[in-house]
Amino acid sequence: AVVFDPPPALWAEADXQQEPLRNLTQTVGQYLPTLSGXLAE
């Protein structure tokens, strides 16, 4: 499975404009492996 995990430097650069987007991406990133695991089983 491909996990979207940008380097911290990219997040630091985008903090000012994209904090909500980062939070959403982190939340999705936490749940995607769980969903994929359940579907794989």
UniProtKB/Swiss-Prot annotation:
Plasma. Its main location: secreted. It is found in: Secreted. Disulfide bonds: none annotated. Glycans are attached at residue 23. GO terms for cellular component: extracellular region. Glycosylated. Keywords: Glycoprotein, Immunoglobulin domain, Secreted. Interacts with CRISP3. This is Alpha-1B-glycoprotein. It comes from Equus caballus.
